[in-house]
Amino acid sequence: MKKLFLFFTLIFTAFAANSGLFDKKQTFLKVDDAFAFSATLSTDKSQLQAHWDITDGYYLYQDKISAELVGKSNPLSLHTQQAAELHQDPYFGEVKVFTHSIDGIFRGTFNNADDKVEITYQGCTEGFCYPPETKVLRIGDLAISQEQIVEKTVEKNTALLSEQDRLADGLFHSKWTIFGFFLLGLGLAFTPCVLPMLPLLSAIVIGQQQRPNMMRAFSLAFLYVQGMALTYTLLGLAVAAIGLPFQIALQHPYVMIGLSILFVVLALSMFGLFTIQLPNSLQNKLNTWSQKQTSGAFGGAFAMGMIAGLVASPCTSAPLSGALLYVAQSGDLFTGAATLYLLALGMGVPLMLITLFGNKILPKSGEWMNTVKQTFGFVMLALPVFLLSRILPEVWEPRLWAGLATVFFIWFALQMSKNGFGYAIKIISFVLAMVTVQPLQNWIWQTQTTTQSAVENKSVSQVKFKQIKNTEELDRTLAENPHSIAMLDLYADWCVACKEFEKLTFSDPQVQQQFQNILLLQVNMTKNSPENKALMERFNVMGLPTILFFDQQNNEIKGSRVTGFMDADAFSNWLKALH
């Protein structure tokens, strides 16, 4: 009896002990319970408002949240009110995640009820990782939210909302904003990227052997600007669709050298070395239609305007970035094209006025016209110098300008008479030639003045950037940032405004004082390497120059991005606002 009692006791004890083996099996929530997702549409249909309720102990990966309009290639960028947290993930290492909840917006144009938005996200919890979850939302099925989400905490300071973001927002909320881009174009007409187009237009109108009347001069100038605007618009849309690689491709040395050769040939023709004209058979046909060959002249002006658009295309400004940002996020090509066209038209109007004014006041006949024509030949030679300075080492730029200026002043001196006022101009021209030749003398004799050395080394010696090669190195460097802010400068050798930043802005004592409390990082985008492309895609870079700012959580400070040139005072105030 005792043995039987002991047997059953052991059996039940074993069952009791082992019954708990499966009690510890953890149950995980369904994905929709772990990450309860909902979405609404703003009243003006410019924002898709997304919300996630995240169960305690679960988290969503920041870089796994994405959205796009079905059938459109451009992704929609997410702006969240909550800051992501650093998390040591057993699957992906150190990552940024969201916990508890997410309130965010996807900006775009959501007017078509049949359009669909595809939103993808992925999350995990301890011991379990969910596969990517995708929600396909039909625009017409979304409820309209009575309260439009504004990015309350997205911007570190509302004053920091960058100009390109304000312009893009303006286009989202009112299509009438496009006419404001015409006024912005007027202001861009006198930037270093647009001014080189003036000699080309002037050479076409003023540099002709037979000076045109005002109506014809206006027609030539107008067609030139239309050609420029067309190229600028098409290239802008291509950049918005393809991205910075297209912009970089236009700056390939082969393209720059080819355009430079073209301008040199045109300049030599203005010196009378040869005449560029159509084949006789085609020219005779045109003469039959119009003895004055107006169609040929007008067609040439339009073609030269298109070439001028190539010269201006790589230059990024806040208005251009705003228009490109709108096109990339909304997919609205019509509004984007109209915006870019009006921006280019505004850039061209001052060029037209300057040319027409010069056409009216300069002499219209006599031997003086040959001198005028040859003078504009020299002016046209400035374009190859401008283009080649983008691809040659920086030291060559002053040498090329010095060579062109020296030859011009010597030539100009030889054109002057030896009597009276002409003799005085001759002496002054020779003196100026002696001054401008100095960079060539220093190069030939390998000498360098103390002042020149100080100027050349000022920005290089006093501003030290840590060079970043890829996204992994960027993340590591940001994680070790001892300062409250990090600045990432995206730079390219062909970018004119980037060089202006280096020489005029970064070298300013006020700016350098602000730099003392900022981690300075720089990426050279000249070669468009795979690492460069990864950075461009990650930060949705539209053009150069672009400067990004990051907080202590390694997040880009929303609204702080700088595109286009800023002078020292404006940039210093921008940095102060960041702090």
From Swiss-Prot:
InterPro entries: Cyt_c_assmbl_TM_dom, DsbD_gamma, DsbDN, DsbDN_sf, Thiol_diS_interchange_DbsD, Thioredoxin-like_fold, Thioredoxin-like_sf, Thioredoxin_CS. GO terms for cellular component: plasma membrane. The chain crosses the membrane at residues 178-198, 230-250, 254-274, 296-316, 337-357, 376-396, 397-417, 420-440. It is an enzyme of class 1 (oxidoreductase). It catalyses: [protein]-dithiol + NAD(+) = [protein]-disulfide + NADH + H(+); [protein]-dithiol + NADP(+) = [protein]-disulfide + NADPH + H(+). Residues 449-579 form the Thioredoxin domain. Keywords: Cell inner membrane, Cell membrane, Cytochrome c-type biogenesis, Disulfide bond, Electron transport, Membrane, NAD, Oxidoreductase, Redox-active center, Signal, Transmembrane, Transmembrane helix, Transport. It is found in: Cell inner membrane. Residues 1-16 form the signal peptide. GO terms for biological process: cell redox homeostasis; cytochrome complex assembly. The keyword Cell inner membrane applies. Its EC number is 1.8.1.8. Disulfide bonds join 124-129, 193-315, 495-498. It is a multi-pass membrane protein. The keyword Signal applies. CDD domains: DsbDgamma. GO terms for molecular function: electron transfer activity; protein-disulfide reductase [NAD(P)H] activity. Required to facilitate the formation of correct disulfide bonds in some periplasmic proteins and for the assembly of the periplasmic c-type cytochromes. Acts by transferring electrons from cytoplasmic thioredoxin to the periplasm. This transfer involves a cascade of disulfide bond formation and reduction steps. Belongs to the thioredoxin family. DsbD subfamily. This is Thiol:disulfide interchange protein DsbD. It comes from Haemophilus influenzae (strain PittEE).
